[in-house]
Amino acid sequence: MFDCSRHFPAFNSAKTFLQVLLGFIRDCSHPSSDIQLDHNEPLYIVELGAGSGKFSYFMIKALEEMTAVFDFPMRKIVFVMTDFTENNFNFWRDHPSLKKYFDSGQLDAGIFDAVEDTSITLWKSGKTLKAGSCKNPICIVANYLFDTLYHDIFQVDGGLLKEGLISVGSKNAEEPDPLDPEIIQRMDNRFRYNTISPASYYTDEEGDEEHFKRILLWYKDYFKNTSTGASLLLPVGAMRALRRLGALSNNKALVISGDKGNNHPEQFSGLMDPHIALHGSFSLMVNYHAIGAWFTSKGGFALHNPQEEASLKVSCFVLDSSLSTPGDTDWLGSSLSEKDTARSAKYPHLCRAFADYVDSFGPNDFFVLQKSIKEDTPNPPLRTVVALLKLGDWDPDVFFKFRDCILNHAPTCDQKLRNDLCRGIPRVWDNYYMMDMEKDIAFEIGRFYYGIRDYANALYYYTVSSDTVGMHHVTFHNQGLCHYSLGQLDIALALFKKALALNAEYEKARSWIEKVERETHSLPGLGSKVACLSLLDSDDATQFLNLSEIPHDVI
């Protein structure tokens, strides 16, 4: 259902975005702020293109945990999930992790097509957010969305501004089925470039004509004397969507966005056709610099992460119409960055949060770190993995990636490190947002507790696994091992038989049935109360632990 080709460290990013949002609210709460908050009115946080809802869940969960430090009544904050498909909406509506937030009114949802919609009708409250209806600034979160919206192609060549036009065909001479989705893998794109005038290119942009013209003139001026020229995309789809959303709150808005893209003009040097990435659909690099220029032209400002080597760029934008300067004609060269610097000085908490949580060590850095530990270190130390888990606040995806290291080393690590794991592992499950059946997090947590001989907790999570993912013969088998270790032979035998009933070829269950039956018959009268005589301390301990297997052959 969902595009899983993008890598976004969700929980780490959600907390980062929330810290930036908190900084913005603190600045708006100051008596001297140009944007005054009304504590009697809702403050809407809207995620565009929420997809599976996983990021929304992490954000509202983190928001709930920060209630004590938020400078705004938590009961008046409403997180709104949006997407353009009914399927995604239905998935959120029925998701058990979101239910309590929907029931409380803290979470709402609505269909919103970023290409054309001008309002959002909320499912739970029945309210419609439309132009001028939001008294407080609207806070917008957009991850991996802008790269899929409309872009215009431009080049600066020999001091001339040119528009790029694309003709799309197939590499095959004929396509029997023009609706075949695999055609996207055979796209044959041809580009041509025609000289244009920036002043007259955009003529119907609902009041944004002057702002778009300023952006084009800025790029033409910046690259006019370069021998290499420049190639750039103007994310008009993103800017049009943000224009319509900004209108909901009378042009008072905060936008936080993460995507693959560029935020410095030097990254556009050279004449080349735009790169089109294919991943089930297709997408383009987001020109965050241009989006920032649009905000600045409208009276706002932009904060960009200056890190150049990053697959995920995060930028923050503020729209504050009170900062606009009517009659200002200075929009070339360094004037944009100078305006950003002057205007952002009125938002010190926002700037500090962005510097601390994005610039210093942001979502991309976390992704790079965990990827390097996973791929470049064949056998990472357990202490390193625990430190990474703590840095990501026990993100279930990180736990799943490093489950083998945890399961292999937890039974033999020192007690202090094991205690650290035991304090954090419950949060892994607390943070879990189920999307599919491929990652059985509860089962893996059960394996962890089984490995450290905490059979009661192991049984609990094995039961959760059966309830959430479904019955599996290995889960029943492992439950049987737990009960055997607790001396509950009758229950263990029943579970081994359940495992064999689900998979008649599962020889390990058959062997354990024979073993338990022999022991039961040799100890008459003790039944289920027979004690397990320190089995894991015997020479068979390693073999015994190895019987706790990964279900469905997932590695």
For each feature predicted by the language model, list its residue ranges:
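Conserved SAM-binding loop of SAM-dependent methyltransferases across substrates and taxa
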Residues: 52-72
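S-adenosyl-L-methionine
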Residues: 1-44, 57, 87-132, 207-216, 439, 459-462, ...
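Conserved SAM-binding motif I beta-strand of class I
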Residues: 70-71, 76-83
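A short SAM/SAH-binding and catalytic strip from SAM-dependent methyltransferases
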Residues: 123-158, 227-240, 249-255, 261
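Alpha-helical linker/edge segments of TPR/alpha-solenoid repeat scaffolds
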Residues: 484-494, 516-541
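Rossmann-like AdoMet/SAM-dependent catalytic core
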Residues: 212-467, 471-477, 481-485, 491, ...
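A mobile, often basic/glycine-rich helix-loop segment
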Residues: 142, 147-206, 276-280
